[in-house]
Amino acid sequence: MKKALLLTVIILVFCIAAEGCSGFPSAGRDPQESTSETAIESAEFEMLPEKDQAELLEERVALEAQRKEQLGAFYVPLPELGRETDLKTVKAKALYLTANVSGFNFNEDDIHYYADCIDSMAKGSPKPEDPDRLAEINKLEKALAICESTEVNALVIDIKNDDGLVAWKSDIEIVNQIGSNWSSPLKDYEKLIEYLKSQDIYCIARIVAFKDPYFARAMNGHAIQLLNGGVYKDDAGIAWVNPFDKYVWQYIVSISQEAALRGFDEIQYDYVRFPDHAADYNPITQFPGRDGRDKDEAIEEFLEYANSELLPYNVHISADVFGVATRSWDDKPEDIGQTWRKIANQSDYICPMIYPSHYGPGIYGYAVPDRQPYHVSRLALMEAIERNAAQRHPGIIRPWFQGFTANWIKGSIPYDAKAISDQIVAAMELGIDEYIIWNASNNYEPMTFFYHGRIDPNTRKPGEDILARSPAAAVKRYLDAEKGGKFSHLYLLTPISERHEDYDAFIAQRKTSLEILKNYEIINVVKDEGETYTAIVSGEYHSTAGTAIIHEAKYKIVPENNIYKIIKPELTWIP
């Protein structure tokens, strides 16, 4: 999604020209295009003549004054001229940490000691004989030791949590006005960030977006409203802010900008959605600012806005989605604002929370999905891959994996190192080499990350695509979709260049023509030169244009983004 900014001069010119870096993106503006038109390439601020530097600094002061007036209580300064950070990109393998744990004191000797213990365990050596010292090593030190001694190279740290509390003392006026940082557990964030940078650990700021009971209570006019007056609260008694409300957007993004200024490489939005159980609350609530839009439009537009406003800060953006987002289509029936393609197209990373414990009986064919960490993860990720393959430039899939035991589920299994890493193995076999482990208590088993010998490089048969689908199976699925009017399947199975990119336009065209396959027979599937195949098909189509009889017609089967897709032959209609 993002382009690295070559220097902050670019930001300066862009902000002045667009009257931007504040407010909201104008309709149709692509935040990715904003730098290319104004870039002064191959220049560095430090290498400019002193006079030019002075002029730019003077202009920056004026710009910041203008931005401060425009943004008011949401003002966050731009990165300092000459001190910009490069856009850092890694294949993140991450652990989640609360702000409380991240605020613990840490001792580097203890980190190294625990890292040595991990190394000994990985090599099959007896554990060290100093249990007293091990007992004194805190959760933060253990997490940092895991980063030192395993493939884990990233941490996801709460900066605004599920209660709406900001992790540190903030310079943002609105945060201080409402007091959302009253606890500030991450008091010495500079020390932690400095250490993470010194160890090349990728820093991800978790920002809970719209589940924010603190802001909803402090400024209840910006919460989801009840039709008969008052603020809506979910089944747990928690108030949510209104995702259609641009005032809320500014609040969330200002905290994101501050996290970027303080050294985070990525901003991750969790609860970037509406409350679940929408069927229960839809009839009794209202969303000021909705103006007839669907919920997934609000989430899409928020992420577009966040992209635009965070562009000068040189950070990636990621978005967490429910595991069901890999299975549902157009946010139905959930109606919580999470449509996969709309979020993937506005994020650098899309992070489905595919915890096996969160799937009900029968999902993916398993009575207790929690007992099948490998298979559930594999099937869910195959769905995610198929959805991503239908977009030109979607965010990279980086799944959340279950790092906890779900004791509340009848028939559940202990999620030990083997069960947790089974999920990682499933991802790696599908070519997904990033992940985040969730454990709310921040207790992580280091042996989880020594799984590599269990990866099977031959999970696919020769000729199958990444979904383990043969050319014959792909064309059959396509023809069944044409026969059954399954537009979402047709959208996924048609090459991007052969259809409308926008799904709404795609289905509008299909519904206008009323084209449907009445019957078909696959005569044969033959391999062409290279990686393509041809299916020989006979059958009959009906539409508003008449009838089209196909006799041994050739359907091309082509790989796109590692998935077989179908190019249908031209049809001749008889009125």
Describe these PLM feature segments:
Residues 150-185, 276-283:
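Aromatic-lined carbohydrate-binding/catalytic grooves of carbohydrate-active enzymes
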Residues 472-473, 487-534:
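Short solvent-exposed beta->alpha transition segments
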Residues 138-164, 261-266, 346-349, 427-434:
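Catalytic domains of carbohydrate-active enzymes, especially glycoside hydrolases
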Residues 202-212, 268-269, 295-336, 392-404:
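Aromatic-lined carbohydrate-recognition surfaces of secreted/lumenal glycan-active proteins
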